[in-house]
Amino acid sequence: MTAATPDRRAIITEALHKIDDLTARLEIAEKSSSEPIAVIGMGCRFPGGVNNPEQFWDLLCAGRSGIVRVPAQRWDADAYYCDDHTVPGTICSTEGGFLTSWQPDEFDAEFFSISPREAAAMDPQQRLLIEVAWEALEDAGVPQHTIRGTQTSVFVGVTAYDYMLTLAGRLRPVDLDAYIPTGNSANFAAGRLAYILGARGPAVVIDTACSSSLVAVHLACQSLRGRESDMALVGGTNLLLSPGPSIACSRWGMLSPEGRCKTFDASADGYVRGEGAAVVVLKRLDDAVRDGNRILAVVRGSAVNQDGASSGVTVPNGPAQQALLAKALTSSKLTAADIDYVEAHGTGTPLGDPIELDSLSKVFSDRAGSDQLVIGSVKTNLGHLEAAAGVAGLMKAVLAVHNGYIPRHLNFHQLTPHASEAASRLRIAADGIDWPTTGRPRRAGVSSFGVSGTNAHVVIEQAPDPMAAAGTEPQRGPVPAVSTLVVFGKTAPRVAATASVLADWLDGPGAAVPLADVAHTLNHHRARQTRFGTVAAVDRRQAVIGLRALAAGQSAPGVVAPREGSIGGGTVFVYSGRGSQWAGMGRQLLADEPAFAAAIAELEPEFVAQGGFSLRDVIAGGKELVGIEQIQLGLIGMQLALTALWRSYGVTPDAVIGHSMGEVAAAVVAGALTPAQGLRVTAVRSRLMAPLSGQGTMALLELDAEATEALIADYPEVSLGIYASPRQTVISGPPLLIDELIDKVRQQNGFATRVNIEVAPHNPAMDALQPAMRSELADLTPQPPTIPIISTTYADLGISLGSGPRFDAEHWATNMRNPVRFHQAIAHAGADHHTFIEISAHPLLTHSISDTLRASYDVDNYLRIGTLQRDAHDTLEFHTNLNTTCLLYTSPSTRD
């Protein structure tokens, strides 16, 4: 007996483990059957000029109707009209819910890489669906390229075949090709969308007539809960392209002769057919919170059933509707008292309305102290969108729950007398209603009943408090001083069109959205196309001005237009000499850009030691640099800090070139000198030159080297100091002689002007300074550069020196005396490098760079830009130039 005891304990222990395992599995199963689903994005085209959810909400809140006379492009309303619906071949109404802002032939086939021939064969319902689905993803902040290869599903409601019927009557047998079936078979509505996006989840088309798109929502939620999908695009599409279906509906007695859906009203006499498309983007709530998605509402549960054997195949079944509503509440783990509003099917037929009212009154009779159930129907605004009706109702409910307002239900004056007395306890939203305060999340139900008997009901709930999910999205840091808006398009005209739309949105519906948030969405949550332009702006007004300029193909501060053609590889940082300084340079960067501020702070001790002044104080105070020493030290300090700024945004040099004293900064950036050594070289050079201040100057001439040599042949004290470009040179020498030569050139109708400098470097005047330069820098210990330096100090650019110049004392003595061979250095670099960025407080060399490249290469294959601009907004100017470099790549910088 004793020996058997451990066996019993083992059995009991094993049994308990199995119970725990089964309990855990049951909990998982229960969760998967009722897991909340987030609505994270929506797109639509509806009657009333509605192109997006914001415009849809505006229409609803304004109590507007989208019903219009049948457009002449569809059919001749008068030719088919007859007030007697029993007359064959006629229609008892001339009205409909037609799209006024989109036409079937407006599809942008090229954008979706669809050939014109294939697009022409496609049912316009498919064309419309593709565009709206794309916009829904944009609304969700899901870049379309991120869907490729993922378990993203597509569930679409489609019922009409107007286009195929039209083609069948028009095309001859010889006109039929492979595009006709693929363009008109309903299954391709989902399959083609999945193909365009590269989605790998289920792609299913549902046809349950009027309930198609809400049944699609139910199936999508099941797919998400079952882990068959990780995200779902769900919608419906419907276009009225032929009078045939309207003739049939009229004979059936379903259409309103007045052309209005008077849902639940005593005068209801039928519905108005409508067209449109809508798509919602769904995701498991936990995943949406984890990924930082904006959540518009949450699907708590849903149900689908069938009328079964009612009094007729098209007659609604009250008990079936009641069972559906009860099942949806059970699926949501809610009671009738938890629901505040129901977006009803509500077609406005004398038969269907009373049955639906009675079903609602019976299921929601037990309100347990809650306010009256409010009901309404979007069909009074849009008409009956048939396959798209369910998702249109869902969108209205989502917007109502999200905004805490129930829009007005149109065309209602007196409750239909055909409903039971209990229906009078329902509150029809004859006026707009602020959502009742209940102390719990706002909740709504959405019904959609198919004419063939398949019914759907979805229960939605207000999204959770965003603060509850704080920290789930990666922190974006402080709001940037300048925001960059990236505007994509497959072609430059499409970029312009998008910029125009975005400008209108920023000036209107998006006026309250922070500019930094707009930039973040555009830069991180939009599909990246082959062309893009950028607008950098410090505020909304400047952003709108920039976007309108981009749309018009005009220049404006902060605007970088799409670039045509390609740029080769290789980036050169070019460091100018004197002349780029100005009071206030870098002050805005010091406040806005941490990398720039950190570089200035790192250099500060050396400035105090070498120059006896604080560069930070000069920059922060917007002061002038005074005297040779301050100017030269201040410029190299700016150049090193600007280099750090470029590098902080991922732009780094493959080679460096220094112009005159700019070669010191180039040597530091290349690693040949430390910053302290670079400042020392600059301080020694400027200190030695200071006594010569006022004894020399320079002049820029629009002459090539040969003409300049001839010009100065009789002036031994004047030298050709700089080979600027193939057609420009700079001479150096005593002021009186330089002025005399300037006059000579001008007398020959040539261009000549003084350079703002008070000494004459690269001139025999420097000979006397060279020994002291060698002596004071004798202990300088440079290192081999880690980045190639193309030296402007030597006739052969330093190439004959094996591994290049040593950048020791001898080099810097030679640098101050020899002519600057800038033209030759740029021409040499142009063979392997295609981007030239001048690192300075104001561009002095970009013109010479362009001239030099143009003489030897196709200049359109090169980019030449500066960094800052005199008296301009530092941060804005830098980001504009940064954005210009981003056009070299297939995608822009991911920084905002």
Set out the residue ranges of the language-model regions.
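Acyltransferase
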Residues: 301-302, 306-311, 598, 618-839, ...
